[in-house]
Amino acid sequence: MSEKKRVRVRTPGGKELELTPEKTWVLAPKGRKGVKIGLFKDPESGKYFRHKLPDDYPV
């Protein structure tokens, strides 16, 4: 199993942390370039949140 890269994100609590996304996908309108989205879990509150991933992130 390959290790996913850590991404620097701002959590809903306002802190900036390096987290690994639990799930990634591409969100794209029909016929256009999309953006990569990651699902992260806040380590403090346990809440899930979404954040944009860099374009070079493997999906």
From Swiss-Prot:
UniProt entry keywords in alphabetical sequence: Chromosome, Cytoplasm, DNA-binding, Methylation
One GO CC term, this protein: chromosome
Localization, UniProt: Chromosome; Cytoplasm
Keyword match Cytoplasm: yes
One Pfam family matching this protein: Cren7
Gene Ontology molecular function: double-stranded DNA binding
Keyword check for Lipid metabolism: no
Main location: cytoplasm
InterPro entries to which the protein is assigned, alphabetical: Cren7_sf, dsDNA-bd_Cren7
Subunit structure, as described in the record: Monomer.
Protein name (Swiss-Prot/TrEMBL): Chromatin protein Cren7
Organism taxonomic ancestry: Archaea, Thermoproteota, Thermoprotei, Sulfolobales, Sulfolobaceae
Underlying gene: creN7
